[in-house]
Structure formats: C-alpha cells, structure tokens
Amino acid sequence: MSDDDKRHMELARLLVSLFPGRKLNGFLVGLLHSLSGRYRLPKELRGDRVPSSSKLARFIGTLDRERHIHSYFWDLLRRERPSRVGDIDRVARLWEEEGHWKGLESLRFPAGEVFPQVARGSSDNNGAPPLSFTLSHGDPKSDPEPSSPSRLVNTGLSEAERPESPLASDQCLVTSHAYFFWLEVGAWIEGSIEDEPVSLPEDLPSGARLRVVLFSSPGGLVLQPDADQGVLCIEGDGRVVVERPACVPPALQSRELADRRLFFPLRTPQAPGTYRLRCNIHHEGLLVQSRDVVLTVAEQPQRQSEALRSRVDYALSQTLSPTHLRQLGSATLSVLLNDDDWGTHGFRFVGGDDYRSSVHLDDAMLQEMISLARGAFRRASWGSKERYEALPSRPPYRYQGAQSEARLREDLVMMARIGRQLYDRVAEQLGQGADGADALRERMRLPGHIQLALKQGARHLVPISIFYDHRLDVALKDFTLCEAFIRASVASEPLEKSPCFQGDCPHREDRDVVCPSGFWGFRHTLALPFGMAAQGERGLMDLPGVLRIRDTPALLIAVSEDPDFVLRDNHLMRLQAMSGVAPIQVARSREKALELLRQQGSHLVYFYCHGGVDAETRAPFLQVGPLTDPYIFRDTLRVYDIRWRDPAPHPLVFINGCHTTELEPEQAIELVSGFVERAGAAGVIGTEVTIFEPLAVGFASRFMDAFLRRRLSLGASVREARLGILQHDFNPLGLVYLPFALSSLHLAGEASEGTSVAGGAGALVTPPA
C-alpha cells in the first residue's frame, strides 16, 4: 500500500469513528457543498448504512488529488468534533509531513475570501499547533466561518405534538395519526430524509422567491387544503427564510424555527402501506425541482430501513443558481404527469395566483387519450387513424399541392371534436367539476407558456397540443370555420398577432364554429423539457436556457441519401443560403456524421433522415447516409464518445426523420433522451406521428429562420412555424412537432446576460408518385 493509500485509509477510519451512521452522510454532504457543488456523493456513500473504509478511502483520494484535504478541512473537523481533537491532529500530521499544506496562499474558498497566511498559535496538549487564519483584508479570525450560510434542501417528518423534533428516516409513521412534512434550506439537519441533498447556491439574489407545493394521491395521505403550499425568500444576508408559511404548528415552541422551516400538516390513512407525496419547487411559475416522497405507514410504531425517504426525480436546475434560473424563463401553467402505485396517473397543475390542482386518470383512459390524438393527426395526414406502415397500401399525403379551405375545415372540425373531449376529461376533474374546467379555460385564455414536465422514466407523452378549449358542441354535425381566422390568414400580418390568437376570437363562445386558436398548441407556446435528476450520464449539467455564440450560430446537418427524398437538396441549398448563419457542415454518411458529432461547436444538429425500430432489439434508431449504412442507436453515442462538454455549446438536436416502422414517442423517448442525458444536448425536437417530406421541409425552414436567423426563443420559433404552415399552407399538422427542451432556449452573444426572449423522433415519408 502506497503512502497516499495509507493516508486515505487512516482518514476514512477516522471519519467513520467521528460520524456514526447517517451523520457521516451529513458531514460529507456539507463538505461537498463547501466545494461549490463540484462533486457528487457516490451512491455507495449515501443513506444510513456505514460505508466500508475502502470505499470511503477512494473518495478521499479524489479530494486529495484535487488538493482539498488542507488546513480548512482539518479545522472544519475540529469544529465538528472538538472532543476528538487529538485523534484528528494525529491523522492531520500525515498530510502535514508530506507537505500537503504548501501553497495555501493561493487557495480561494467558497466564501470568496483568500487565505494568504496560515498563522499558528500555541501548541495544544497533543503537541499539534492549532490553526488560525489571517484574511487578505487584514481582519484576523481564529475560527473562520463561511460568509454565506449553508443552503442544503432538507425535508422530513415530525409528529404533530412535537413539530420541532424530526423523525428518524427509519421510523415508520402510524396509521390515522397527524404529522407535519417539513422543508428547510440551510445546514444539514439530523433527521432529513433526502436521499441526496441538493444545495441552493450561495449567490442567489436577495428577494428571490421559491414556491413549494405539495400533492397527494386519492386514498393516500391527507393534506390540509389551505396548507399545502408555502413561499421561501432569500434574505439580503443570504439566509433562506419563510415569507409565507403553509401552516404554523400550534405546538411549535420556537417562533424562530417557523421563520426558516415550512410545515405542511398531513394525516396518515387508516390502512398501513407505502404512500407518496409529490413536493414541487417552482420559480416564476416554472417547475424547477420535484421530489418523490415515499412514506411507510404501519399500525404500530416500528423501525424499518428507509421508512421515510425523499428523492429528487425532476430537476431543470440541480443548483438553482440565479444565472440559470433567469435562463429558464417562466410558465403560465406547469403540468407534471406523475405515475402512482395503483396504475393511475396524476396531473399536477400549478399556475399563478396560488393556482394548483390535480387530476387522476387510470392507465386505460390516458392511453385512449393518446390514441385519439394520434389518430386525429394520422387522419389529417393520410386519411386513416391507423399507423401508416400498417395499411395495406400507402395512401398519399393529403396536404400535397395547393391549399384547400374545405380540407382544412374538415380536419380542424375532426381535431377540435377530439381535442375538446380530451380537454373536458382533464379539466372537469380539477376539483370543482364544470367550475374547475371554466376556471382553467379563463386562466389560459391569453397566449402563455405551458410546461409539460417530463420526469425521470416518463412513459407517456400527453397530447396537450390538441387540447381545444373553445365552447364547442361536439354532438353537432355542421360546423363553420371562423371567418376572423380566414381573414387573418390572407392578411400580411402573421397569425400570432391577430385577435383570435391573442385570446379575443369573436366565436370563442359559439358552439358550432371552429377556430384553430382554440387549440393550445396554436395559442400557447408548449415545451416538454426533460428533468434530468438522478441521470448519472450527464453529471451536474443544468438544462441550458441559452446557447452562446460569438458571431453566428453553427449548423450541422446529417442527411439520408435516400433517392426518394426529392425535396432534400433544394432544402439544403435554402438553409445554406440563410443569412446570419455560419457555413453549414453537411454529413452524407454515417461515418462523417459521427465524426462531426464528436466535434464541439455546433449550436443546432439537424437530422434529415430515416428512423425506426430495430426488428430484433426493438431499439429506436436513426439512419443517415446511403441506405446501406449502419443505424445510429442511443448506444452509438457512448461508443463514439459523443458528448458536448462545457465550455462548448450544448446544441439543440432537431430530428426530422422518417421510417418504415412507425416510431411512437414512447419508443423514441429512449433515443431522444439519449441526446440530452448521454450527449449533453440542450434539447430535442421530434414528432408525434409519421410526417411527409413537404411538411418536414416547410416546418424546418420556418423554425430555423426564426430560431437561427432572428434568434427567437425555441417556444416562440416552434409556435411561429406551426402558425406559418397553418396560414400559408392551410395545414394544421405543425401540431405534431414536439419540443423536448426549455421554451426559453435561445441564442445569445457571449456578452449577453442571457435573459429569456420572446416568445420524439418522428417519421418522414415521401409522398407516393
């Protein structure tokens, strides 16, 4: 064993003896927080179980190699365990003897203070000189504390009679009893049930507000309706305090505790079992973190490993840093689909003015909603609700050729009937029946931003773009098309500026008139950003809201050489002629595509290709280059080390793909998420159903002009492309495009602050001759 290994093992054994059980986890989490969030605690060191000394020693070796085992570390240990100073100094001397404290004058600690000298006082009884620090500005401190308080997010449970005393994570709750779920941001709290505590950054601006909202499932834990949300605020001194409590426990003896800890009253059900809470943190209406809280309820008090636990399973921002929070933008309505343990799905709605509600659908109803929506898109595209490849003959693309008002009316009526039924199924379960549906309808009348949050392991993509909320009698047979829309479509002004799409359609209350502005996907900007919590492949990368450019954005295009793509070459020529874009790189083979993907610097990666599902492995793929070239799978990204790393841009990936075996979004999600989680993309654009080449070219051209040349946000660019196709081609199928990214994602110069601006791999088939 080398001298380094011996030092690491000695320190590991010391830490195990200093911090028994979960206390070791708390110390390590606090230590990593002091290192500005650069490291994550390995899985084997999390939880209540004491890790082996060898595993802990390996982690210490990582810190040692980065020069983090220095005087500040040992001083922290002395403060934490003053009764064990002798043991601490004995191990510390192993580092001092090897000269590991040299060069401390160059260290900058998280508080932002430089320690140019290590001043030594008189020796203690153990012969080791205690350390004191002299700050660069000449203000000596014998026992320095960070200038900013810790900002770990702690959650836990306490009994209603003793709200200030956290329950241990191995303590089961008891049936039919009252408790408090609590959340506090600060130093590590004994009794916190977080699997992996997430820290708020030290530089959150004064006045920043975080809204914490709790949800439960029917038949489970009972929340108090008027005490299920609270607000935290960042004070000028950096502390995180309660601005608006959810509830102040009557038995709470410490008013000071109520000023920093949110308490949410709950009652356990009569039956023992495992129950869940959903704890959401919102900033400016946008869901930025969500926790799955799992609680074990027993008939009698008892101990059980991990009886109480909280796990972050959705996080647009791991760090909640102010810069990143500003990039995320805002949301008028945030919707999280949450699977529970009984085969049902909970929609968690959160909006402004304290709006929050839940809808619960069983699996069969949700699947039917998805099938109805995709069937409507298929009927509009090729005249049948069946999948394209399942048909005995290949029907033509219905929107080939000149625009037709009659065809558009037929398809909009068909889609509106389905969209209205889907909207009613969700809206009328919002807690107040028809009143709940009307309240949501009025809330969403004006154009806004809708976030459909895709948490880890999402299996369903809810078709909210087809939701239709104008007052429509779906039983009628004869409908007319809104004449205000017809007039606006032939005007020079873009549709998004017309009264209908600003929430003022004159036929909004008419039961026999259909207007495309009634569809959420036309009136609002929609986005489905991945929450990447606990996705180890991409480390600590926050989902970016800004793509930095120096002069012009860089575009990489990978194309299929299928000769049936008759619009491809002209499409590429038009993109290459687009002003304000750097020279475009084009890959016409798989080998070249992988080579260019490995390079750093692209802001948008565009696949104009085939795709599908492999017959043997059922894995989704993309096919570029000659038809004889091998496929690109999710694993291909790892095999070829395709990963976009800072400081290079994390590009947006646009998949305009076709396949002979239709790739449904639930299958495509594996490939789509791979570009985000494994390769580090900012997001992905895909489609709900098979698309034809004219639609692919029309949508992509409009989107890229808005996103790359005019630098609108992704959400605004997608909406503009949808409405452009609707206005100029009388084609509603722009609704099939899905943006798996932040709606606020946009291009910005390197000197820009990056504040937000305005505003599934699908299938592409060539129309039969």
Swiss-Prot record:
It holds the Pfam family CHAT. Coiled coil: none annotated. GO terms for molecular function: peptidase activity. This is Probable protease Ga0334635_1659. Residues 118-167 are annotated as: Disordered. InterPro entries: CHAT_dom. Disulfide bonds: none annotated.
